[in-house]
C-alpha cells in the first residue's frame, strides 16, 4: 500500500521535475531568444542612434556652417551698409563743402564786382575831378586872356587916342569915338570866338554823359508813336447790322449814345460803323460794348445798358492794371490806389502822337539813371519822372493846365514835396527847388526829342514851319530861310555884304533865342547860318 502511494508520488515528483526541466529549458530558450532579440534590437537601436547622432552632428555642422555663413553675410551687409553710409556721409560732406565753396566763390565774385564798381566810381570821380580841374584851368586861362586883351585894348585905345589927338588935333571924345568904331568889328569877332569856344567845351563835356544816359535808359524802353485820333472804327459782319444798331425809330442808337457819351456815325461806308468822341476812354468803352452787342446779336436798350456797364468795368480794370504795371516796371511799391488809377488813364492819352503813359515811364527811367549818376535819391527821382504829366489824364475833365491839375493831385494823395515841385516846375511855371526837378525837365526833353518819339497833325506842322521861317527872315541881313528835316532844322542864307563871318554865330544865337521864346515845338531845332561870298573874274 505504501508502494502504491509512493509510486504516484514519485511519478508526480518525476513529472514535476521533468516538467520543471522542460519548462526551464523552454524558458531558457525563450530567454535566450529574447536576449538575442534584445541584443539585436540594442544593436539596431545603437546603430540607429549612431546614425541619428551622425545626422544630428551633420545637421549641427550644417547649421553651424549656415550660422557662420549668415554671420559672415550679416557682417558683410553691415560692412556694406557702413560703407554706404560712410559714402553718403562723404557725399553730403562733399556737397556741403562744394556749396560752401560756391557760396565763398559767389561772395568773392560779389566782392570783386563791388570792388570793380568802387574802382569804376573812383575812376569816374577822378575823371570828373580832372575835368573840373581842366575846366578851372581853362577858365583861368580864358580870364587871363580876357584881362590881357582888355589891357591890350586899353593900351591900343590910349595910343590911338593920343595919336589921333596929336595928328588930327581932335578932341579926346571924338578920338575915342573913332577908335571904338574901328574896334567894334574886332570885339564882335572876339565875342563870336568866345561863344563858339564855350559851346564846343560844353558840347564836348555833355556828349559823353548824354550818350551814357541814353544808352542806359532809352534802350530799355522805347515808346511807340501812335496817331492822335478822335474816332474808332467797328467792323460789321454785314450792312444789315446797321439797321439793328439804329433800332426802331432810332431808339437803340440814342440809348447807346446817351450811355457812352460818343457819337455813332453810320454812313454809306460798307460794313463799318464809326464812333466819334474826344475822350479816348469813352470811345474804348463804346467800341467794346458795340463789338459785344454785334457778336451777341441781341440789340435793345436794356441789353445795351448791360453791355456798356460790363465794358466800362473792363476798361476801368485795364486802367488800374496799366497803372500797377507801370509801378512794377519802375520798382515803385507804395502809391495811393486812386492815383494809380489816374496814372493808368494815361494809357489812353497821347501828346503829339506819343503815348503819355509810355512817355512817363521813359521819363521816370531817364530821371532815375541820371539821379543815380549824380548820387541823388533815385526812388524820388523815378517817382517824380513818372508823375510829371499825371495831370494830362483828366485835364479835359477839370479846368486848368495839366501842370496845375498834376500838382493838385500830388498834394491830394500825399506825394513828397520834391515830387510836387518837380511836377509844378517841369514847364518852368515855378522855380525848381531841387536838382531832381532839373533832371525831370532834362528827361522830359530827351524823351520828347528822341527821333520818332513825337509827331503832330499836318495843320500844326505846316503852321510851325511857316512860323520858323518867318522868325528867321525877320532878322537884318537874312536873304532867305528854309525849314528842313520836318522842321528840326532851319537853314538861314545871309547877305555877305551885311553880315560878317563873326556875326553869323551871333545871328544863329539870336534866332535860337527867339525860337525858344516865341514857339512851342517837340524836340530840338537846329539853326544853321550860311554866309557865302563869290568873287568872279572873267579872263578874255
Swiss-Prot record:
Matches recorded under Gene3D superfamilies: Hypothetical protein af1432, K Homology domain, type 1
Task: Name where it's found.
Answer: Cell membrane
Report the PROSITE patterns cross-referenced here: HD, KH_TYPE_1
Q: Which GO terms describe its cellular component?
A: plasma membrane
Enzyme Commission number(s) from the entry: 3.1.-.-
Q: Which molecular function term from Gene Ontology is one that the record holds?
A: RNA binding
- What SMART domains is this protein classified in? HDc, KH
* GO process annotations (BP): mRNA catabolic process
Does the UniProt entry include the keyword Transmembrane helix?
Answer: yes
Q: Sorted alphabetically, which InterPro entries does this protein's record hold?
A: HD/PDEase_dom (IPR003607), HD_domain (IPR006674), HDIG_dom (IPR006675), KH_dom (IPR004087), KH_dom_type_1 (IPR004088), KH_dom_type_1_sf (IPR036612), Ribonuclease_Y (IPR017705), RNase_Y_N (IPR022711)
Q: What is its main location?
A: membrane
Q: Where are the transmembrane segments?
A: 4-24
UniProtKB keywords: Cell membrane, Endonuclease, Hydrolase, Membrane, Nuclease, RNA-binding, Transmembrane, Transmembrane helix
KH domain location is 230-293
Pinpoint the HD domain residues: 356-449
Lineage: superkingdom: Bacteria
Q: PANTHER family per the record?
A: RIBONUCLEASE Y
Family from the record: Belongs to the RNase Y family.
Q: What does this protein do?
A: Endoribonuclease that initiates mRNA decay.
Q: What is this protein called?
A: Ribonuclease Y
Species of origin: Lactobacillus gasseri (strain ATCC 33323 / DSM 20243 / BCRC 14619 / CIP 102991 / JCM 1131 / KCTC 3163 / NCIMB 11718 / NCTC 13722 / AM63)
Gene that specifies this protein: rny
Amino acid at each position: 500500500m505504501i508502494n502504491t502511494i509512493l509510486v504516484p508520488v514519485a511519478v508526480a515528483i518525476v513529472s514535476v521535475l521533468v516538467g520543471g526541466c522542460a519548462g526551464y529549458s523552454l524558458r531558457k530558450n525563450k530567454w535566450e531568444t529574447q536576449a538575442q532579440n534584445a541584443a539585436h534590437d540594442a544593436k539596431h537601436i545603437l546603430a540607429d542612434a549612431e546614425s541619428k547622432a551622425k545626422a544630428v552632428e551633420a545637421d549641427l555642422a550644417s547649421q553651424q556652417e549656415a550660422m557662420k555663413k549668415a554671420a559672415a553675410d550679416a557682417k558683410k551687409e553691415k560692412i556694406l551698409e557702413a560703407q554706404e553710409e560712410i559714402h553718403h556721409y562723404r557725399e553730403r560732406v562733399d556737397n556741403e563743402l562744394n556749396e560752401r565753396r560756391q557760396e565763398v566763390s559767389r561772395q568773392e565774385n560779389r566782392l570783386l564786382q563791388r570792388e570793380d564798381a568802387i574802382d569804376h566810381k573812383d575812376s569816374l570821380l577822378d575823371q570828373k575831378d580832372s575835368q573840373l580841374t581842366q575846366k578851372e584851368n581853362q577858365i583861368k586861362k580864358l580870364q587871363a586872356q580876357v584881362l590881357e586883351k582888355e589891357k591890350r585894348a586899353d593900351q591900343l585905345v590910349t595910343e590911338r587916342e593920343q595919336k589921333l589927338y596929336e595928328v588930327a588935333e581932335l578932341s579926346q571924345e571924338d578920338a575915342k569915338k573913332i577908335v571904338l568904331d574901328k574896334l567894334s568889328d574886332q570885339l564882335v569877332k572876339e565875342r563870336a570866338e568866345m561863344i563858339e569856344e564855350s559851346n564846343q567845351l560844353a558840347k564836348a563835356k555833355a556828349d559823353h554823359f548824354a550818350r551814357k544816359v541814353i544808352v542806359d535808359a532809352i534802350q530799355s524802353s522805347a515808346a511807340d508813336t501812335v496817331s492822335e485820333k478822335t474816332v474808332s472804327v467797328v467792323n460789321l459782319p454785314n450792312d444789315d447790322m446797321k439797321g439793328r444798331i439804329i433800332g426802331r425809330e432810332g431808339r437803340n442808337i440814342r440809348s447807346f449814345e446817351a450811355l457812352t457819351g460818343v457819337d455813332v456815325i453810320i454812313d454809306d461806308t460798307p460794313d463799318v460803323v464809326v464812333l466819334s468822341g474826344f475822350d479816348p476812354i469813352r470811345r474804348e468803352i463804346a467800341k467794346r460794348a458795340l463789338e459785344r452787342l454785334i457778336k451777341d446779336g441781341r440789340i435793345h436798350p436794356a441789353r445795351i445798358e448791360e453791355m456798356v456797364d460790363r465794358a466800362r468795368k473792363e476798361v476801368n480794370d485795364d486802367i488800374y492794371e496799366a497803372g500797377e504795371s507801370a509801378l512794377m516796371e519802375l520798382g515803385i511799391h507804395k502809391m495811393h490806389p486812386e492815383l494809380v488809377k489816374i496814372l493808368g488813364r494815361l494809357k489812353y492819352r497821347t501828346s503829339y502822337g506819343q503815348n503819355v503813359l509810355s512817355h512817363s515811364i521813359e521819363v521816370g527811367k531817364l530821371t532815375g539813371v541820371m539821379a543815380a549818376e549824380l548820387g541823388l535819391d533815385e526812388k524820388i527821382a523815378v517817382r517824380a519822372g513818372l508823375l510829371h504829366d499825371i495831370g494830362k489824364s483828366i485835364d479835359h475833365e477839370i479846368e486848368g493846365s495839366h501842370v496845375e491839375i498834376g500838382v493838385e493831385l500830388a498834394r491830394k494823395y500825399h506825394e513828397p514835396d520834391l515830387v510836387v515841385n518837380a511836377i509844378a516846375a517841369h514847364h518852368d511855371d515855378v522855380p525848381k527847388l531841387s536838382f531832381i526837378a532839373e533832371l525831370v525837365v532834362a528827361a522830359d526833353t530827351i524823351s520828347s526829342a528822341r527821333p520818332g518819339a513825337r509827331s503832330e497833325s499836318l495843320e500844326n506842322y505846316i503852321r510851325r514851319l511857316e512860323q520858323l521861317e518867318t522868325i528867321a527872315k525877320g532878322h537884318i541881313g537874312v536873304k532867305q530861310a528854309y525849314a528842313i528835316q520836318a522842321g528840326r532844322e532851319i537853314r538861314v542864307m545871309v547877305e555877305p555884304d551885311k553880315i560878317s563871318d563873326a556875326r553869323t554865330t551871333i545871328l544863329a544865337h539870336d534866332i535860337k533865342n527867339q525860337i525858344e521864346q516865341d514857339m512851342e515845338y517837340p524836340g530840338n531845332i537846329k539853326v544853321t547860318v550860311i554866309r557865302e561870298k563869290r568873287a568872279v573874274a572873267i579872263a578874255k
